């Protein structure tokens, strides 16, 4: 008997509902041509949830996510809700509590530049002519974003603010094991990012990563300081495979890697907990300026679905087929507006149709 999977679908705001429709096309192909038993159920989140329920993360949505095997998210936010108090705005009032509720300790941000699209990168052609494939593994629950004490003080004419960078050994061990396992499934290379020449937390980070590495003798481990890796990624991104980062450094590096691909509309992301339950979403925003114009790139949403199938369902072969369908579509010259050199481009729904068609052929 085949396992039945349940996905909580959160289309959200902006272009989210549009690109989610294209992910549905891929799901339908998986049902009809690959005999996968996948059920989906939609729930409101973000701005649309505020409009419909008066709250960005309704209890019904949270319960729906709890009863699923994974969460597939579109996008959240828009100008319509920017006048709300900051803690009530869609992004902060929905994503942060959702991540906290499920204890997502790891963020995966792949940055792939396909050689067919190397003209999009701001880097020189001789650097990116073969494309690149980097996976940033970012620790999500520790570090300076959550460390205490933190605050701001004014004493007479003196004003200052302070934050605390703190990492517990178990947090580093947990994220390091995951990064090594991912490196083992790729090119067996892992680069750990720190600032161990200055920060005590980074000294511990490096010591613990070295300790964990003894369990993965087949993975080549290297260490770089955050300032150096920022330069090295620009100089030669192909030298890297998996990057292991703390919360702050991963925030910086993942955005740099995204920028040098030339189109964030191509990039998926995943947030995972210890049970491999995950939240999968495009790395870009809700893009309200192009909402409803049928020109958004659905590839990031489709690749987010691929990551869901890979990490939460453990169906690597199926995920590879989705990835290959995207690659083959690009090789054939099909492009959406954001990645096209000219006016000859596909609409959002057309790109979804083409990718679904290529996937059918790879049965």
From Swiss-Prot:
Localization, UniProt: Cytoplasm
Binding sites annotated in the UniProt record for substrate: 99, 109, 138, 227
Cofactor(s) required for function per UniProt: Mg(2+); Mn(2+)
Gene Ontology CC annotations of this record: cytosol
First-tier enzyme category under EC: oxidoreductase
Catalytically driven reaction(s): (2R,3S)-3-isopropylmalate + NAD(+) = 4-methyl-2-oxopentanoate + CO2 + NADH
Binding residues for NAD(+): 78-91, 285-297
Biological process (GO), any one: L-leucine biosynthetic process
Residue ranges crossing the lipid bilayer per the database entry: none
Annotated site (Important for catalysis): 145, 195
Pfam families the UniProt entry points to: Iso_dh
Protein family: Belongs to the isocitrate and isopropylmalate dehydrogenases family. LeuB type 1 subfamily.
Name the UniProt record assigns to this protein: 3-isopropylmalate dehydrogenase
Organism (species): Buchnera aphidicola subsp. Diuraphis noxia
Organism phylogeny: Bacteria, Pseudomonadati, Pseudomonadota, Gammaproteobacteria, Enterobacterales
């Amino acid at each position: 008997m085949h396992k039945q999977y349940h996905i909580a679908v959160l289309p959200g705001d902006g272009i989210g509902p549009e690109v989610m429709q294209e992910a549905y096309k891929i799901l339908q192909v998986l049902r009809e041509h690959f005999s996968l038993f996948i059920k989906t159920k939609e729930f409101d989140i973000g701005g649309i949830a505020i409009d419909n329920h008066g709250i960005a993360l309704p209890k019904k949505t949270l319960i729906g996510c709890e009863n699923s095997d994974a969460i597939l998210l579109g996008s959240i936010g828009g100008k319509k809700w920017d006048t709300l108090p900051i803690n009530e705005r869609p992004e902060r009032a929905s994503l942060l509590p959702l991540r906290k509720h499920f204890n997502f300790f790891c963020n995966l941000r792949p940055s792939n530049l396909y050689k067919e699209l190397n003209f999009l990168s701001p880097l020189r052609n001789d650097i990116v002519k073969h494309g690149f494939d980097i996976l940033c593994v970012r620790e999500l629950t520790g570090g300076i974003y959550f460390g205490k004490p933190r605050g701001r003080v004014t004493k007479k004419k003196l004003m200052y603010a302070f934050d605390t960078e703190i990492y517990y050994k178990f947090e580093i061990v947990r994220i390091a094991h995951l990064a090594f396992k991912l490196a083992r499934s790729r090119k067996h290379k892992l680069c750990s990012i720190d600032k161990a020449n200055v920060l005590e937390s980074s000294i511990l980070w490096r010591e613990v990563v070295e300790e964990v590495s003894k369990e993965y003798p087949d993975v080549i481990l290297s260490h770089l300081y955050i300032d150096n890796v920022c330069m090295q990624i620009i100089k030669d991104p192909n030298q890297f495979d998996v990057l292991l980062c703390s919360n702050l450094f991963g925030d910086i590096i993942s955005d740099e890697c995204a920028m040098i691909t030339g189109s964030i509309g191509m990039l998926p992301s995943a947030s995972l907990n210890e049970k491999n339950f995950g939240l999968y979403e495009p790395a870009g925003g809700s893009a309200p300026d192009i909402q409803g114009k049928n020109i958004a790139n659905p590839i990031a949403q489709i690749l987010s679905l691929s990551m869901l199938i890979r990490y939460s369902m453990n169906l690597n072969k199926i995920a590879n087929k989705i990835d290959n369908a995207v690659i083959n579509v690009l090789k054939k010259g099909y492009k959406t507006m954001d990645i096209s050199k000219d006016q000859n481009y596909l609409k959002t729904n057309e790109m979804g149709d083409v990718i679904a068609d290529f996937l059918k052929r790879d049965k």
